[in-house]
Amino acid sequence: MAEILIHSTSSTVIPSVDPHQVTEVDLPFRIMKLLDESHPIIHKEPVHWQFGVNPDPKRMHDVMIENMVYHRGLGLSANQIGMPVKVFAMRVDDSDNAIVCFNPKIIKESDETVMMKEGCLSYPELYLNVKRPQAIEGTYQNADGDEINVHFEGLAARIFHHEMDHMEGNTFLNRVSRVFLQSARRKQKKLLRKGRQNGRTD
């Protein structure tokens, strides 16, 4: 398992829900529609979250966690569910801990990089080999507006880095070559076609 160092104790225990069984009625917060790559919000840089102006950051925190769980993601950005603000949720390890990052920033990236296959909720069945830093140092505000400093390694660094792409109006498509993307798109079409034939809807 990849080592993950977290210089923060402000994580949230993810509710124990089975995403295969949950319905909107079971969740205490409204589930938002997941936007796919065709929506312009995905490709536009979100605006900063303004504490004292934007409504109820603690409710926003909970909505982000619930939607990440419902949509079965390792991370989820607010613009992926129709809210163009710089906020994302992410799992910080392979247990039930998660954080919600308001106005996140990357301060430093390691020179060491890792190539790894990853996906994105807004691009169903598309998997790309993406090179990202092995470790990052970052900062974000929690729901109380406090600034939190973090150091992530391994998978957590990759998730934070992936979600930061969304914070700039970019996606993981911007990190691969056109030739590789064309090949991955062909595989995506086959997987989507197979899913429809098998009656899958997710």
Annotated model-derived regions:
Residues M1-D202:
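Positively charged
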